[in-house]
Swiss-Prot record:
NCBIfam families named in the record: miaA (TIGR00174)
Protein name: tRNA dimethylallyltransferase
Entry keyword set: ATP-binding, Magnesium, Nucleotide-binding, Transferase, tRNA processing
Organism of provenance: Bacillus cereus (strain Q1)
PANTHER family named among the record's database cross-references: TRNA DIMETHYLALLYLTRANSFERASE (PTHR11088:SF60)
Region named Interaction with substrate tRNA: 39-42
Amino acid sequence: MGEVQREKVAVIIGPTAVGKTKLSIDLAKALNGEIISGDSMQIYRTMDIGTAKVTKEEMDGIPHYMVDIKNPEESFSVAEFQERVRKHIREITERGKLPIIVGGTGLYIQSVLFDYQFTDDAGDAIYREQMEKLALERGVEYVHKKLQEVDPESAERIHANNVRRVIRALEIFHTTGEKMSDQLEKQENELLYDVSLIGLTMDREMLYDRINLRVDIMMDQGLLEEVEGLYNRGIRDCQSIQAIGYKEIYDYFEDRVSLEEAVSQLKTNSRRYAKRQLTWFRNKMDVTWFDVTDGEKTSEILRYIEGKLQLKSNNSK
């Protein structure tokens, strides 16, 4: 018997503000595709401006999945993301369409494409509570430092402010004696799909200028009011609020910083995040990069995907 044909998937990754959204919609139109968000924060309802969520107008009739599926107070795991996205890939393929994953959350996207296994082990609730208490009493940096001591690779990948993931990585080491990063490395080798994985990059100074401008536009669009709505609903200490764009403005509402300082910190954190994204993608995934410093490369990228996945676009003769 011949080899089972794997489902075709196009993936667009890259740092924040590089232009992934517009490209994905152009490609979906040309390739008869439907889009799956690979962003761990666009899943949350009412968190639109700070996550740079694709608007109905931008979607231009192209179906989008993994957007607005959770309330801000709900938690969400990479295992749940993996399960839901694989189901969407199957269903989109069955409809004769091309699944296009677009986003910047590297671990989430990687968990879908490769043969990652997530255990159903509930972990150690007592240990978890101890770590949560430590984070409250000694600060998140203290707990992050503990992770650096036992699993430096995960500590590098997981930001100190992402307390839940820091504690989860510590919990895995505590319960299994294995580093989370080692568990993932062991499962990283085999692609489950026929994948065209492309990345967008650009001159760093230009990217940073775009990020700064994007933050200014977000403020003009009403980011302050969006975050105030969440704050007034009593949403605290949730996974969603640890997102860049929300935690900084929360500091303002809690009188820890001025609004000017909050916006400045938001720009700094966004630039740092973009740098971490690029480092992660370059170290962890076999990406074909397209430099869009001098303008979009839609036609070139389209030709590349057609060749890699042996597709014909609507633009082809």
